[in-house]
Amino acid sequence: MSSTPAVASATPSHGALPAYDTPLGITNPPIDELLARTSSKYALVIYAAKRARQINDYYNQLGDGILEYVGPLVEPGLQEKPLSIALREIHSDLLEHTEGE
């Protein structure tokens, strides 16, 4: 008997459908690649949350004809959340970030 623990696989060995869909959102882009762009996980959270707030405010102001905030810098997917858009912008190096701002 092997001492190696069993690992669930998304690709079944017997030709059936996978047990789950490929995860999207916070795992895409990968968290390790996002962390490489900031000094800490806490800085990443604040950075992404501030940008997501700007994107959300942009969508809210569109109906009023005010253009105070910058919209998404990447093509947003259908029904994509502002935080996911912000994380993709960070991953694509489309934003400049200064620690402490």
Curated annotation (Swiss-Prot):
One of its GO terms (biological process) is DNA-templated transcription. It holds the Pfam family RNA_pol_Rpb6. Its EC number is 2.7.7.6. Keywords: DNA-directed RNA polymerase, Nucleotidyltransferase, Transcription, Transferase. SUPFAM superfamilies: RPB6/omega subunit-like (SSF63562). It comes from the Bacteria. One of its GO terms (cellular component) is DNA-directed RNA polymerase complex. Residues 1-13 have a biased composition (Low complexity). Residues 1-22 are annotated as: Disordered. InterPro entries: DNA-dir_RNA_pol_omega, Pol_omega/Rpo6/RPB6, RPB6/omega-like_sf. It catalyses: RNA(n) + a ribonucleoside 5'-triphosphate = RNA(n+1) + diphosphate. GO terms for molecular function: DNA binding; DNA-directed RNA polymerase activity. Belongs to the RNA polymerase subunit omega family. The RNAP catalytic core consists of 2 alpha, 1 beta, 1 beta' and 1 omega subunit. When a sigma factor is associated with the core the holoenzyme is formed, which can initiate transcription. Promotes RNA polymerase assembly. Latches the N- and C-terminal regions of the beta' subunit thereby facilitating its interaction with the beta and alpha subunits. NCBIfam families: rpoZ. This is DNA-directed RNA polymerase subunit omega. The gene is rpoZ.
